[in-house]
């Protein structure tokens, strides 16, 4: 909603919580909320990260339980794997500016086009833990993997439209916050079918927790000066608050294979089913406008809204040099982000499926003690922000297409007969990731 003003202003706005990386929209009443979620579908382990995520055709340690369960059958001894990760998020969102038209030049309505800002958040967590046990042609593994650990906070200040004829429009300013935790627990198994072919299957329990809120504020006073001034977010000027919440789980499947084409060349693939969870939402009244209920009273509540997370297909090929020192690996992932708007039956916004390309290399100094490995990698993360498919200026202002990102990674590993330690870094515009992992076999 928006109201126009001839010079003395009255306001209205639209409730919307902004776009980043990976987004889940929830339609509520005549308004719309978009919750920023930044999920990582990268494989666990610092070794995989050093390869730029090109690991599905290798999958030769306990992290294969997630990356490609077929790889577990390559293990010679039981293994315990543990990983800690640190994430430095920089989540972009539209802060204000012009949804359409030229600025009036009054107060904060002075920007041609849109203003953007970022929500910065740092997190550290035990991101992966697994235990793998091989026996003859069969291997089993249990694991825990963190998909997401993210908090977001943002404020809008003065998103305007109109002004070409008689009227200026200022949408409601908003304070937005969300917290997301998404963890997977899995049991994976692998079986050696023949000398050259392995298959794997995983059963995954996905546990999702989300808390998000957006509060709309009118300008501080009903004056022209205040209409074009920064918002102080006064409690007495709140219009509505909308909350979204998830506390749900789902069971999914993972299947994979490894095919040794020759002694030096191998081909692998994996399919990972996306989870479906239920979202609840409610809208409550603020203090400014009489909406028929007291401030804090519920205007709308709904539960059980299904959201499907993407299915993922991955195929890769890896080559090892005759002396075993150099390994080069390539992987293609298809991430079906369009499952999200399709599950919500949205017709005014969409997300494109993404074709990720991963490339990495490892060189091992075989004569060193302990054995030292260095790794370099890169991968393409295509744009997968929710974008508007309608001509409404406000929706288009907040649901803008994003940019493709190139990630660059590097890693270092030390290995003895029983113990392996790996360190890796992955750098991109929206998130930098650091990983430290260890594997012990016994």
How would you describe each model-predicted region?
Residues 1-9:
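N-terminal secretory signal peptides that target proteins for export/translocation
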Residues 13-25:
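Bacterial N-terminal signal peptides
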Residues 16, 57-59, 185:
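Short hydrophobic "helix-edge" motifs at membrane interfaces and signal-peptide entry regions
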Residues 27-146, 401:
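N-terminal, post-signal peptide beta-strand-biased segments of exported outer-membrane/organellar beta-barrel
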Residues 31-48, 123-442:
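Outer-membrane beta-barrel porins/channels
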């Amino acid at each position: 909603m928006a109201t126009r003003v001839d010079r003395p202003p009255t306001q209205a706005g639209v409730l919307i919580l902004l776009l980043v990386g990976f987004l889940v929209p929830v339609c509520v009443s005549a308004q719309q909320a978009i919750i920023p979620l930044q999920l990582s579908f990268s494989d666990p382990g610092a070794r995989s990260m050093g390869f730029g995520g090109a690991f599905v055709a290798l999958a030769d340690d306990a992290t294969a339980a997630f990356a490609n369960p077929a790889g577990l059958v390559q293990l010679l001894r039981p293994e315990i794997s543990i990983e800690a990760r640190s994430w430095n998020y920089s989540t972009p969102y539209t802060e204000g500016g012009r949804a359409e038209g030229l600025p009036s030049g009054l107060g904060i309505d002075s920007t041609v086009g849109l203003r953007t800002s970022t929500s910065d958040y740092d997190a550290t967590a035990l991101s992966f833990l697994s235990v793998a046990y091989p026996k003859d042609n069969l291997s089993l593994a249990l694991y825990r993997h963190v998909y997401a650990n993210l908090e977001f906070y943002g404020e809008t200040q003065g998103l305007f439209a109109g002004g070409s004829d008689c009227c200026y429009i200022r949408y409601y300013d908003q304070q937005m916050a969300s917290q997301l935790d998404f963890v997977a627990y899995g049991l994976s198994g692998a079986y050696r079918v023949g000398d050259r072919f392995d298959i794997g299957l995983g059963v995954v329990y996905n546990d999702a927790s989300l808390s998000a809120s957006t509060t709309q504020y009118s300008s501080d006073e009903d004056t022209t000066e205040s209409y074009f001034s920064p918002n102080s977010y006064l409690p007495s000027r709140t219009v509505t608050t909308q909350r979204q919440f998830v506390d749900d789980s789902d069971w999914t499947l993972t299947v994979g294979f490894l095919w040794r084409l020759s002694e030096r060349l191998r081909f692998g693939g994996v399919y990972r089913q996306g989870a479906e969870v239920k979202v609840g939402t409610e809208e409550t009244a603020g203090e400014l406008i009489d909406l028929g209920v007291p401030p804090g009273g519920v205007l709308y509540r709904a539960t059980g809204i299904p959201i499907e997370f993407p299915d993922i297909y991955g195929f890769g090929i890896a080559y090892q040099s005759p002396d075993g020192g150099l390994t080069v690996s390539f992987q293609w992932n298809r991430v079906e982000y369009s499952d999200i708007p399709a599950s919500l039956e949205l017709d005014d916004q969409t997300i494109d499926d993404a074709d990720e390309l991963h490339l990495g290399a490892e060189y091992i100094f075989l004569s060193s003690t302990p054995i030292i490995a260095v790794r370099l990698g890169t991968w393409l993360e295509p744009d997968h922000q929710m974008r508007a498919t309608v001509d409404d200026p406000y929706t288009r202002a907040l649901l803008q297409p994003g940019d493709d990102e190139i990630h660059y990674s590097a890693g270092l590993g030390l290995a003895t007969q029983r113990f392996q330690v790996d360190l890796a870094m992955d750098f991109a515009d929206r998130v930098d990731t650091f990983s430290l992992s260890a594997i012990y076999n016994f």
